[in-house]
Amino acid sequence: MADETPKVKTEPAAEVKSPLDEVKEIRKEAELTQTGSDEKKTTDPEFITVQDPNGDEPIELPTVDGVVLMTTLQASFPGATGLKYKNPKTGANRAVQVDPSGLKLIAPADGWENKTFFVIVAPQSERVRALSSADATSAKRRKVGSSDDSDSDDGRDGRSGRKRAVERDSQPVDLIVLGVDFKTTDECFQKYFEDIGTVVFCEIKRKSDGNSKGFGFVRMSSVGEQNKVLAIPQHMIDGRRCDVKVPDGRSLQDKQGRPSISRIFVGRLTDKVDEHQLRKVFGDEAKSYIETAVVTDVFIPKPFRGFAFVTLSSAEAAERIVSKGSLTVNGLSVGLSIAQPREENNQSVGPDYGLPAGYRNRRERDRPDRRPIQNEAPLPMPFVRPPQDYSYRQQNSPLERRYWAPGDSRGPGW
């Protein structure tokens, strides 16, 4: 009988992992975990339904990490300050909580699902007040910070200034009528201009006793009719020649406070240039800048002195023409400049240092621009003390000898 020994099953020895293998397994598990989180991140975000306050179709807004960004809400609904929804238990509107920073809308306790949200917008009066305060602050900042570069910047102030100038030139103004006969009545004065167009306002200025002052004002119904009046070189009203002009531009001032002048000095002229040529050249040039601008007056001094003055109805057109520097009239290049008004303070001929009394009045009287006064008496010659000779002079007359010192025969001064 054979010796039977029990067979013992031998299990294979456990595999011993090296440290390198353990590191590889840890990295593999980390990669799997990262892949799962990436898959969660790439899933579509949750959307909430927001009703447009204007009654349009609702809009779905995305959420980021369970919150709605205020920038997303305001980009979709300008002026929005928050969200609200209807509480089914109480029937009242419940506002969505805003975080302290004011940048996020926190989800309700039961989440964003199954709810329709409505936009909360500030009242219009508060928005207007906020916008006006912001505009006032920015305007104050511009006023403080832009004093130096306001002339060089062609910003909003420059555009508004040009807009006001265009609006002023596009509306009829009160035209001044000079040289009106003192016997002309208001009816005759108005009838003359009604033959040209529709008169809105017409008046002859009178004194307190009712007598005419010799001038008046008229306003036409449109700029076109006003230009018709200004285009007539001579107006004969009640048998008398009258001048019709736009009121003096010195009453209008630019933003620096300087007067706006519409009178142009034209130099380098020859006697071959006449008034008609100046009117045509400057009228066409003015209309190229301001459509309603016309030449209101041309003055050529007599006797001819080589220059003239051209007055336009628009100061802006005059400035633009002068900025060119020169124009060609009858084949001749003429010089241009703004005709500055003569200041009253600069009419004296100069200081009167060291002059005797009475010479100042004499110089004022002899000024070429001074009007003579009728029956004016001539000024008396001032008393001027004759020059004194302080050198020794022999005095031999008996009258002078009495002033000598007693006993001195050589005369005074010895």
UniProtKB/Swiss-Prot annotation:
**What broad class describes the main subcellular location of this protein?**
nucleus
What function does this protein fulfil?
Answer: RNA-binding protein which regulates transcription, splicing and RNA-editing. Limits the accumulation of double-stranded RNA by maintaining the abundance of the mature RNA transcripts that are formed from double-stranded precursor RNAs. Stress response protein that acts downstream of daf-16 in the insulin/IGF pathway to regulate longevity and the cellular stress response to osmotic, oxidative, proteotoxic and endoplasmic reticulum stress. Involved in the regulation of physiological processes including aging, fertility, growth and locomotion.
Q: Which InterPro entries match?
A: Nucleotide-bd_a/b_plait_sf, RBD_domain_sf, RRM_dom, TDP-43_N
Q: In which tissues is it expressed?
A: Widely expressed in a range of tissues including body wall muscles, pharynx and neurons of the midbody in adults and larvae.
**The organism's taxonomic lineage, starting at the top:** Eukaryota, Metazoa, Ecdysozoa, Nematoda, Chromadorea
Write the gene name.
Answer: tdp-1
State the source organism's domain of life: Eukaryota
Example GO molecular function term?
RNA binding
Q: Where in the cell is it found?
A: Nucleus; Cytoplasm
Query: Subunit notes for this chain?
Result: Interacts with chromobox protein homolog hpl-2; interaction may maintain localization of hpl-2 to gene bodies.
Q: Which residues form the RRM domain?
A: 173-259, 262-341
Task: Enumerate the Gene Ontology biological process terms.
Answer: determination of adult lifespan; hyperosmotic response; mRNA processing; positive regulation of gene expression; regulation of gene expression; response to oxidative stress; RNA splicing
Q: Where is the composition biased (Basic and acidic residues)?
A: 1-44, 153-167, 361-373
Name of the protein this chain belongs to: Tar DNA-binding protein homolog 1
